């Protein structure tokens, strides 16, 4: 008899292991542990300068929801300067996509791959070129 837990899947984004304060290689560990549950993966590059500031934003999230007028003050430097990380195209970022795909193949992943361009730097024509670069780069990793 199948239980609900067996029928649930995970939408996974390896870049979140970086910007949410995780160990830089956490996405590989998470993939090894949970990859058999992945049903949808985001393909979004990330580069990060120093430690993540994002966990402090989440601490204040409930307060910001109740008092949106205080959002800028509560977020402090995080709101004013998000330059401690960016989301360049996959393949010119910090994620080891070859190793991540090896983990996906280990689990016989056959789910979706979604390119997710959120960069503040890669906008307009540069953003379009970045998406094309990501498509080419990821295609080369597909068997």
Whereabouts are the PLM-identified features?
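A generic secondary-structure signal
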Residues: 30, 103, 137-141
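A short, acidic, flexible beta-alpha connecting loop/helix-capping segment that sits on the rim
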Residues: 114-130
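Acidic/histidine-rich catalytic cores of soluble enzymes
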Residues: 1, 5-94
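C-terminal helical cap(s) of enzyme catalytic domains, especially alpha/beta-barrels
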Residues: 125-143
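Short helix-capping segments at alpha-helix termini
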Residues: 5-8, 106-109, 143
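A short, acidic, amphipathic alpha-helical segment used as a generic capping/interface helix at domain edges
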Residues: 92-106
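Conserved, mostly hydrophobic/aromatic
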Residues: 13, 41, 104, 113, ...
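A short pocket-lining beta-strand/turn micro-motif at the edge of beta-sheets
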Residues: 37-39, 86, 97, 108-115
């Amino acid at each position: 008899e199948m239980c609900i837990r067996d029928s649930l899947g995970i939408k996974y984004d390896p870049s979140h292991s970086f910007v949410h304060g995780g160990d830089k290689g956490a996405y590989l560990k998470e993939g090894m542990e949970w990859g058999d549950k992945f049903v949808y993966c985001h393909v979004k590059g990330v580069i990060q300068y120093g430690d993540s500031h994002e966990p402090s934003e989440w601490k204040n999230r409930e307060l910001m929801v109740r008092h949106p007028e205080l959002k800028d003050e509560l977020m402090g430097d995080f709101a004013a300067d998000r330059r401690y990380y960016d989301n360049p195209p996959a393949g010119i970022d910090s994620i080891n996509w070859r190793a991540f795909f090896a983990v996906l193949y280990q689990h016989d992943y056959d789910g979706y791959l979604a390119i997710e361009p959120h960069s503040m730097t890669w906008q307009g024509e540069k953003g379009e070129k970045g998406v094309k670069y990501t498509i080419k780069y990821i295609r080369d990793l597909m068997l």
